[in-house]
Regions:
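Conserved structural motif at the start of ABC-family nucleotide-binding domains
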Residues: 5, 20-22, 76
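Conserved ABC transporter NBD signature motif
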Residues: 27, 59-70, 75
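Catalytic Walker B motif of ABC-type/P-loop ATPase nucleotide-binding domains
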Residues: 152-156, 161
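Helix-to-loop junction immediately C-terminal to a conserved catalytic motif
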Residues: 51
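ABC-family P-loop ATPase nucleotide-binding domains
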Residues: 73, 83-139
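ABC transporter nucleotide-binding domain
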Residues: 167-254
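The feature captures the beta-strand-to-loop junction immediately N-terminal to the Walker
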Residues: 36-38
């Protein structure tokens, strides 16, 4: 099995704040993994440690079999990273930015990078500071993809993009994955985008993995059980993830299986969005069993 990212007891502290708290995770290569969680869950911290920008406070991490802190030079030539704030030098032109990419990356594909910025109508002589948010996002993604990476790590790549620009970027990402097959970790809180492109889902809460699994398997293994008299129903055949109370109805997200009954309850498959939201909300309240 090709494990591209593996952590064991990974911790990261900033003063008294623990951003990662003994995080254990193993991701198989060749997939697009969606990393989701509330603000402060540790998503950005995990990606920054994975590319060697921060040193962990404890535990172990391996990316493509390498230690990001100790083997940073060797690792960076094999991965592409787009940070959340897409830090590009505003004084450089698009062409100069690509030239820097060419000089710093031994696997750089200049023909591909030039073709990509041309496709998106980005003049090589135009200053980066004059580009729109969507155009800067495309330049940042070009820098990552021009390396022809084995692994691509994207931290909120569609944040602040308009709907058309967001859709174009995601379609381009899917095309790259289909053509070149890099492993991808996509951090995003836009659940529709995660559902559109991700094959594997990791829900991160409080610096720990709440659940990790293939999207199809998560959908198969979760159901919503709702009805007016649900409080007395036996749900011992599964784990209750979340309970929502309405005026006359109770709905439970259940990890497991439940059979319909004649007491007015309804059982249906949960959508991926309902599963993700259920896990995130369950961390804010005690779940009655």
């Amino acid at each position: 099995m090709n494990i591209v990212l593996e952590t064991s007891g990974l911790t990261k502290r900033y003063g008294r704040t623990e951003a990662l708290r003994g995080l254990d995770l193993s991701l198989v290569g060749g997939k697009v993994t969606g990393l989701v969680g509330p603000n402060g869950a540790g998503k950005t911290t995990l990606l920054q440690i994975a590319v060697g920008l921060h040193h962990p406070s404890g535990g172990r991490i391996r990316v493509l079999g390498l230690d990001p802190w100790r083997d940073g030079v060797a690792l960076l030539s094999r991965i592409g990273f787009v940070a959340q704030d897409r830090p590009l030098h505003g004084g450089f032109t698009v062409g100069e930015t690509l030239e820097i990419g060419r000089r710093l990356n031994p696997r750089w594909d200049q023909a591909y990078a030039l073709a990509r910025v041309k496709h998106f109508g980005l003049p090589l002589g135009r200053a980066v500071r004059s580009l729109s948010t969507g155009q800067r996002a495309q330049v940042a993604l070009t820098l990552a993809l021009g390396k022809r990476p084995e692994m691509l790590l994207l931290d909120e790549p569609v944040a602040n993009l308009d709907p058309v620009a967001r859709l174009e970027l995601l379609e381009e990402l899917m095309g790259v994955v289909a053509e070149d097959g890099p492993s991808v970790i996509l951090s995003s809180n836009v659940l529709a985008d995660v559902e559109r492109v991700c094959e594997h889902i990791v829900i991160l809460v409080g610096g720990r993995v709440r659940i990790s699994g293939d999207a199809d398997e998560l959908v198969r293994s979760h159901v919503l059980v709702s009805g007016p008299r649900l409080a007395g129903r036996d749900v011992s055949d599964g784990e209750v993830i979340e309970v929502r109370q309405a005026e006359r109805q109770t709905t439970r997200l259940l990890r497991g299986r439940a059979a319909p009954s004649d007491d007015g309850t309804e059982v249906r498959p949960a959508t991926l969005e309902e599963i993700v939201v259920g896990y995130l909300r369950s961390e804010r309240e005690e779940v009655p069993q």
